[in-house]
Design a protein with these regions (language model features):
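Segments of small-molecule ligand-sensing domains
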Residues: 286-371
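Periplasmic-binding protein-like
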Residues: 99-107, 127-129, 221-233, 248-250
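Flexible loop/hinge segments that line or gate small-molecule binding clefts
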Residues: 119-143, 252-260
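Extracellular/periplasmic periplasmic-binding protein-like sensory domains
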Residues: 240-314
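An alpha-beta-alpha
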Residues: 64, 151-198, 290-310
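Extracytoplasmic "Venus flytrap"
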Residues: 43-63, 67-70, 76-85, 108, ...
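Extracellular/periplasmic Venus flytrap/periplasmic-binding protein
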Residues: 175-224, 229
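Hydrophobic alpha-helical segments within soluble ligand-binding/sensing domains
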Residues: 141-164, 266-285
Length: 371
């Protein structure tokens, strides 16, 4: 074979040209990213509790702190803002007084007031975690926490010797109801006779109310030996530790605070989601939506199992996670029967996202709600 110098010169020139173009595109891309973050963006965050609550509020605060330097953010918090008209004044203050161009309203009850505020401020990006409303400058996000709840139910069901499990919920909202149901289904998948007893505290953050609900459950059912919860209070974990029973946490992993009683936690991981949404706003590519993100999207997860779990628990959780990953299974695939014997989801069918998100008002078999 005879070499063709002109051919190879042409190929070499082509490679060099391609490299130059790629380099120019990379420089241009980096320039865009640098330009949109060169100016500090003020981000407002309001929630019903405190930023250091070791629970729901801190999960949001820590998420923003984790991306603050990369995106050149100034984070302004408004703590202990009630779910009601008072939130409007707090949001308006973040915009008018603090110059916030992104506002995150981290509680479900803010939603009914948020749409009107978003209409008045089209130049501001609004992000509503756990919400269910949208417009051009407003996006809501609900993680499929019920999937992590199902996994935590497996952990609780395998740990419970009595088959009696307590659950303290904040409000009978669809978000809380579907979590209780998923937890019960997970528990009963490994302990078919398991019973879940629920009491509502009617507050996200009131420690006294969470403690009263926890102690009332134990007074009524002294053989409860595992607690779980959907409140932004660590009180159910504290009560469990003081009574010498096990507990499952929520929002953040607090295993270090309860080394002898904690099993695992259903965690929120907001950082990557906030990063993506804030960048899309800065790039001018933001679209209001209602995002449903599951275990596969990384916004929810089950924290590492502690030394307190029953033998074989990790294998059972891993098997359930593989079922989720296969997309051939989700928690509310039929058959699902409610706690009065009515077939709610027939075999071969599944609940719609809309029903799970907005209209979940019944409880599955094995759940008893205490008055």
């Amino acid at each position: 074979m005879v070499n063709n110098p002109s051919k190879w010169a042409f190929v070499t020139a082509g490679v060099i040209l391609a490299a130059i173009v790629a380099g120019m595109l990379l420089i241009r891309w980096r320039g865009v990213e640098t330009n949109i973050t060169a100016k500090t963006t003020s981000v407002g965050l309001i929630f019903v509790g405190k930023k250091d609550d070791a629970s729901f509020c801190q999960a949001h605060y820590d998420a923003l702190m984790g991306i603050k330097d990369e995106l050149n953010l100034r984070v302004v918090c408004r703590e202990k803002i009630p779910e009601g008209a008072a939130c409007v004044a707090a949001i308006e203050s973040l915009i008018a007084d603090e110059g916030c161009k992104v506002v995150i309203t981290a509680s479900f009850g803010y939603g009914k007031h948020l749409v009107e505020v978003a209409k008045r401020h089209p130049g501001v990006c609004f992000i509503h975690p756990t919400g269910n409303m949208k417009r051009a400058n407003l996006t809501s996000c609900m993680g499929r926490m019920y999937q992590a709840r199902y996994l935590s139910g497996i952990v609780a069901g395998m740990r419970s010797a009595s088959g009696k499990i307590g659950f303290v919920g904040a409000f009978p909202y669809p978000e809380v109801v579907r979590g209780i149901n998923a937890f019960a289904l997970g528990a009963r998948s490994v302990a078919p006779g398991a019973q879940v007893y629920v009491r509502y505290s009617f507050s996200w953050v009131d420690d006294a109310a969470a403690q009263a609900a926890s102690e009332a459950l134990l007074a009524a059912h002294p053989d409860i030996d595992v607690f779980a919860m959907h409140v932004n209070s660590l009180m159910p974990n504290r009560v469990a530790a003081s009574w010498g029973i096990w507990s499952v946490g929520y929002n953040k992993d607090n295993a270090r605070s309860f080394p002898d009683s904690y099993l695992t936690a259903c965690e929120w991981v907001w950082g990557p989601y906030y990063r993506q949404k804030i960048l899309s706003w800065l790039r001018g590519k933001f679209h209001g939506d209602i995002d449903w993100i599951g275990l596969d999207g990384g916004i929810v997860r089950l924290s590492a199992l502690t030394k307190n779990v029953a033998p074989g628990t990790q294998a059972a959780v891993d098997a359930a996670e593989r079922r989720f990953a296969s997309r051939g299974f989700d928690v509310f695939y039929g058959p699902v029967v409610d706690n009065v014997g009515v077939m709610r989801v027939p075999k071969g069918e599944s609940m719609s996202d809309e029903e799970m998100l907005n209209r979940f008002s019944w409880y599955v078999e094995g759940v008893t709600v205490e008055k």
